[in-house]
Amino acid sequence: MLDIRPIPAFADNYIWMIVLPDGGAVVVDPGDAMPVINTLQRLNLQLTAVLLTHHHRDHNGGINQLRDWAKSNGQSFTVYGAVTSDYSDVLCRDGDTVDISGLTSPVRVLSVPGHTLDHLAFVVDNALFCGDTLFSGGCGRLFEGDAGQLYDSLAKLASLPDDTLVYCAHEYTLSNLRFALAVEPQNQCLQDYVKQVNNLREANKPSLPSTLGTEKAINPFLRVDTATVHAAVAAQAGQKVPDEVTCLALLRRWKDNF
């Protein structure tokens, strides 16, 4: 089982670190270098690789400082990211598999456009690092892509096994769940999950990881195929909802203004 640690950054980011048995570490989306450096030093680890999900600065802003720090210690690491990223040493495309020293299984690359056009997700064993595409109880805003792209991306992620652990990049869960309750107030699984997350946050613990099985039961953006979400969206928008992509687009607009 992977040893995955959250490194809090900024107001609500998580930089995820996979601690490797050989003393290495793989870091996902290091938007800030110092929390990563402090963790590496505290655990006496060497940074082996960086996985980049997309180009927003709160995800890649620490890479140059990390490179300078590694070089000053006689070390180096490899950055795996989109073909559009200036930081990428290895250019990753949908369907690629990447072998990283210290990981017992290859990293699978998924293209998941919507939040950004070049957004990637990485699957390592049963762990999904999905950046800002899928959140617990929500999904990322459409900054570059459209609802059709986001729908396909969420469907791709939802096709993974239900026990897949969801490591998204922000602690947005409680805010997302308030919206989810507005959409499906009678969803018992959602009500139970809200209590669970409240307990975790009151104990100052991350709400993550979630699981895909949980998200399919509580996340309205993965439930646009259900009658309850369709009805709620139609009532809120005051219009017919002819298909799931339209439902997702209207749901995202509702959330943007919630």
Curated annotation (Swiss-Prot):
Question: Which Gene3D superfamilies does this chain map to?
Answer: Ribonuclease Z/Hydroxyacylglutathione hydrolase-like
Describe how the cofactor binds.
Answer: Binds 2 Zn(2+) ions per subunit.
Which cofactors are named for this entry? Zn(2+)
User: What's the stated role of this polypeptide?
Assistant: Thiolesterase that catalyzes the hydrolysis of S-D-lactoyl-glutathione to form glutathione and D-lactic acid.
Catalytic activity from the UniProt record: an S-(2-hydroxyacyl)glutathione + H2O = a 2-hydroxy carboxylate + glutathione + H(+)
Q: What class of enzyme is it?
A: hydrolase
UniProt record similarity statement: Belongs to the metallo-beta-lactamase superfamily. Glyoxalase II family.
GO MF entry, a single one: hydroxyacylglutathione hydrolase activity
Q: What is this protein called?
A: Hydroxyacylglutathione hydrolase
Might you give the EC number(s) for this enzyme? 3.1.2.6
Protein species of origin:
Shewanella amazonensis (strain ATCC BAA-1098 / SB2B)
List residues binding Zn(2+) 2: D58, H59, D132, H170
